[in-house]
Amino acid sequence: MDNIRLIILNYKRPDNVDNIARTYKTIMPVTIVNNNPDNPFPYLGDGIDVINNEKNWLCMERWVRCFEYDEPYKLIVDDDLMPHPSLVKKMYDKQLPIVGVYGKSGVESANSYQELTDHWNENAKVDFIAGAITLIKQSALD
């Protein structure tokens, strides 16, 4: 899976991020984006890129960083989840421009975010994928 770059967005779970990075470092290139300027993330070596931001750039940071790397796919992971490598392979095998484990539907009829329907780990058509674990083809962002 060397054509996928893992981008982990850290804010308050550095121990979990460390576990994710160490699990994946032999499977694919890894980048950690630390959005917590009060708690710099240590450099781990082993080819793991660590970016310590001077301020919290919120969720948009994950998408901006996609443009800095050459791999044709980016696996975006939040700091509170640890995807199993077999899940990533299953997502990749779908060969879709974007696939995730969490999405929402019902935008057309909802009056608020709370009225949207959640879809976790199910094969469903959604209006949008919400963070968590997302595999995206870079060409879908270009």
Regions found by a protein language model. Give the residues of each.
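Acidic donor-binding segment of Leloir-type glycosyltransferases
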Residues: A21-N52
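Conserved catalytic core of nucleotide-sugar-dependent glycosyltransferases
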Residues: M82-D142
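Cell-envelope/extracellular polymer assembly enzymes that use nucleotide-activated donors
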Residues: N3-R5, P29
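Short aromatic/hydrophobic "clamp" motif used to bind/position activated sugar donors
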Residues: K74
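Glycine-rich, basic loop-to-helix element that forms the pyrophosphate-binding segment
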Residues: N53-E68
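Short acidic donor-binding/metal-coordinating loop in glycosyltransferase active sites
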Residues: E54-K55, V77-L81
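Short, charged/polar "capping" segments at the starts of alpha-helices
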Residues: P14-V17, P37-Y43, S109-N111
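Short, well-formed alpha-helical segments that are part of the catalytic scaffolds
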Residues: I8-T26
